[in-house]
Curated annotation (Swiss-Prot):
Membership in a protein family: Belongs to the intron maturase 2 family. MatK subfamily.
Species of the source: Iris setosa (Hiougi-ayame)
The keyword RNA-binding is annotated on this UniProt entry: yes
Any one GO molecular-function label of the UniProt entry: RNA binding
Protein's UniProt name: Maturase K
Statement: the UniProt record of this protein carries the keyword Chloroplast: yes
Record InterPro entries: Domain_X, Maturase_MatK, Maturase_MatK_N
Cellular localisation: Plastid, Chloroplast
Keywords, in A-Z order: Chloroplast, mRNA processing, Plastid, RNA-binding, tRNA processing
């Protein structure tokens, strides 16, 4: 760390940052190795083996890769079989090295480009603690704002962010951020060489991303995608400038922890409210703006635009988005990916919630002197529900239940100690209760917790070679009750006047926490 600090201090006197030499420094790969070890705390993390190699990194291997990658005929060779691709036997040794080296280089490159933006690294050098306000920015804070603004809007438009994205476009976007030409040249050369056997896999699609990036090289993939997200935000700012003559009043750039970048823009205008909720490809970011007539939000690759105006205004916004994206990113964007719906009859998926406007009508008898008359009033309420179908799909992918929601055992956890199995299932339930505490109705959440509860019991019964009924009869049903009710006990302390709800109870209080800095893992996998 001292060597890295000395290099950065020497580099501050230069006009352009030169990051390429850092690829040959061994401590960069030590940082990447420590980051990979930290990934094991993820909920769905499962270690992957790289063809028998361990996860250690060394400077000699990094230098060897950089030399080998510039050699034309020493990379991967693939032949097409009738059913699948098979690697030539005498090239398998080279493939193993290439696969392993690619992980090292991608992690090292991700470390380099994150150095100027890393809040924790700067705080380490300056011996300062990270302000608590930076750690308490919650993605739940956007929902009270939406509840206050969306009640007076008419239409909502779902806009899918254009895809697929060619990697060359992402590299060109990085040129505006990083001025180190050798580093960018090496990144472009590395991407082209590693994916030259299948050019179709060189695209980012909404459902299936590049395997090498989405699995082994998550960090580099996130950074490339975040750079594209930043450019999309500039388009939103451009639309804001075209709709108002008021200048930008304030602009702040804040860096969130967990290596995700958050841009917070407060744009004050006369006829437009712009709320940009930046959710990176795997994690969250939050940005808000204030005004009085329309709201736009972007989350998980989808832009939600809700102006207070006519249907004609929505069509104009649709035309602007299509034109700007095609002109700015130089690829075709289909207009049918933009759907315009009436807000009063539409539910949109937003940050793990199904949000919609619920109209409540009431009749009041008004008495004035000797005359009386009835007054009908209609009030709007933002309803946030747990997306049960999406969560069941996530549990099915993670092998906790079937597609129809029938609980099953988790085979890969059956070899763990009983306490570890209960702790993992309990942590999932607590995280779900914590994240979806703002739901208007808890019945869907109870169903998800019930699936996890039975899946935990089936996993324990499978381990002990018994049935669920016999296992619970022997140990008691209270074995699985404690960690399922922990979140409810916390709520009973926060709201002492309310009735604390049990596993089968009902609780209609919505609570938005201020410590939620990431989207729940089950929501990410839906």
């Amino acid at each position: 760390m001292e060597e890295l600090q000395g290099y950065l201090e020497k580099d501050r006197s230069r006009q352009q940052p030169f990051l390429y030499p850092l690829l040959f420094q061994e401590y960069i790969y030590a940082l990447a190795h420590n980051h990979n070890r930290g990934l094991k705390g993820s909920l769905f993390y499962e270690p992957t083996e790289v063809f028998g190699y361990d996860s250690k990194s060394s400077l000699a291997l990094a230098k060897r890769l950089i030399i080998r990658i510039y050699q034309q005929n020493d990379f991967l060779s693939v032949v097409n079989d009738s059913n699948k691709n098979r690697f030539v036997s005498h090239h398998r040794y080279n493939f193993c090295y290439s696969h392993f080296y690619s992980q090292m280089i991608s992690e090292g490159f991700a470390i380099l480009v994150e150095i100027p933006f890393s809040l924790r690294l700067v705080s380490y050098f300056e011996k300062k603690e990270i302000p608590k306000s930076h750690n308490l920015r919650s993605i739940h804070s956007i929902f009270p704002f939406l509840e206050d603004k969306l009640l007076h809007l008419n239409y909502v438009s779902d806009i899918r962010i254009p895809h697929p994205i060619h990697m060359e476009i992402l590299v060109q976007i990085l040129q505006c951020w990083i001025q180190d030409v050798p580093l960018l040249h090496f990144l472009r050369f590395f991407l082209h060489k590693y994916h030259n056997w299948n050019w179709n896999s060189f695209l980012i699609t909404p459902k299936k991303s590049i395997y090498v990036f989405s699995k082994e090289n998550k960090r580099l993939f996130r950074f490339l995608y975040n750079s594209y997200v930043s450019e999309c935000e500039f388009l939103l700012v451009f639309l804001r400038k075209q709709s108002s003559y008021l200048r930008l009043t304030s602009f702040g750039l804040f860096l969130e922890r967990r290596h995700f970048y958050v841009k917070i823009k407060r744009l004050q205008m006369q006829h437009l409210i712009l709320i940009v909720v930046c959710r990176d490809y795997f994690q969250k970011a939050l940005x808000x703006x204030x005004x009085x007539x329309x709201x736009x939000x972007r989350c998980q690759g989808k832009v939600v635009l809700a102006p207070k105006g006519t249907h004609l205004l929505m069509k104009k916004c649709k035309y602007n988005f299509v034109t700007l994206w095609q002109y700015y990113f130089h690829f075709w964007y289909q207009s049918y990916r933009i759907h315009i719906n009436q807000l009063s009859n539409y539910s949109f998926y937003f940050l793990g919630y199904l949000s919609s406007l619920l109209k409540n009508s009431s009749t009041v008898r008004n008495q004035m002197l000797e005359n009386s008359f009835l007054v009908d009033t209609v009030t709007n309420k933002l309803e946030t529900l747990v997306p049960v179908i999406f969560l069941i799909g996530s549990l099915s992918k993670a092998q906790f239940c079937t597609v129809s929601g029938h609980p099953i055992s988790k085979p890969i956890w059956a070899d763990l100690p009983d306490s570890e199995i209960i702790e993992r299932f309990g942590r999932m339930c607590r995280n779900l209760s914590h994240y979806h505490s703002g739901s208007s109705k808890k019945q869907g959440l109870y169903r998800i917790k019930y699936i996890l509860r039975l899946s935990c019991a089936r996993t324990l019964a499978r381990k002990h070679k018994s049935t669920v009924r016999a296992f619970l009869r022997r140990l008691g049903s209270g074995l699985l009750e404690e960690f399922f009710t922990e979140e409810e006990q916390v709520l009973s302390l926060i709201l002492p006047k309310t009735i604390p709800f049990t596993f089968y109870g009902s609780h209609k209080e919505r609570i938005w926490y201020l410590d939620i800095i990431r989207i729940n893992d089950l929501v990410n996998h839906s």
